[in-house]
Amino acid sequence: MKPAPTTQQELLTRAQQIAGLSFAELADEAGMTVPPDLRKDKGWVGQLLEWHLGATAGSRPQQDFEHLGIELKSIPISYTGKPLETTFVCVAPLTGVHGLTWEQSHVRNKLSKVLWIPVQGEREIPLAERCVGYPLLWSPSPEEEAQLKADWEELMELIVLGKVAQITAKHGEVLQLRPKAANGRALTEAYGANGRPIKTLPRGFYLRTQFTAQILQRYYA
């Protein structure tokens, strides 16, 4: 892995230098093997980019470049530049959430400054041939932060009330809560409506595609 960048500009320059390169070229330099597809290797693209950019946090709650206060997010896009899938932000806390505020939340920390790296995501393009796009450094506008905060507070209120099982992907305008587990056996603790502990699937916060589409549109229009 390349050493961690020491400044925001160094990170941005690195990201600009890999723009236009294919996954095959980037994997070759990193000594990584390109999988046939991403069905069993969902995190492969992120790991490839982390290697080239010197990210250190992995999937821990901290930002990928904690010393710079920057989170790295790859975003698969279509031929027309639209996001093809929702963007995972972080795992949602299901216990010990009484009194937790938006300002203290992992979601706000992760999204305070994001280095977005668009990547070709159309399924018919072989993975090795897909290319990395031009990066953008983004922080939420006051309006975007207000949207995120409102959704986060609505979802967290349902968790606090023991209604986690009633939350669907339809909740939230820009931020949604969905099960996040490699299989249905990976259960975690939460609270039921009667306040007693229950076992449920881990949940993750995800950004809706219309939200990330607006970010991309504003920067690349």
Swiss-Prot record:
The protein's name: DNA mismatch repair protein MutH
Organism taxonomic ancestry: Bacteria, Pseudomonadati, Pseudomonadota, Gammaproteobacteria, Vibrionales
Keywords: Cytoplasm, DNA damage, DNA repair, Endonuclease, Hydrolase, Nuclease
Molecular function terms from GO: DNA binding; endonuclease activity
Domain of life where this protein originates: Bacteria
Subcellular location(s) per record: Cytoplasm
Keyword rRNA processing: no
Primary role: Sequence-specific endonuclease that cleaves unmethylated GATC sequences. It is involved in DNA mismatch repair.
Organism: Vibrio cholerae serotype O1 (strain ATCC 39541 / Classical Ogawa 395 / O395)
Listed Pfam families: MutH
InterPro entries tied to this protein: DNA_mismatch_repair_MutH (IPR004230), DNA_rep_MutH/RE_typeII_Sau3AI (IPR011337), DNA_rep_MutH/T2_RE_sf (IPR037057), Restrct_endonuc-II-like (IPR011335)
Gene Ontology terms: cellular component: cytoplasm
GO annotation, biological process: DNA modification; mismatch repair
Regions that span the bilayer: none
Family assignment from sequence similarity: Belongs to the MutH family.
Gene from which the chain derives: mutH
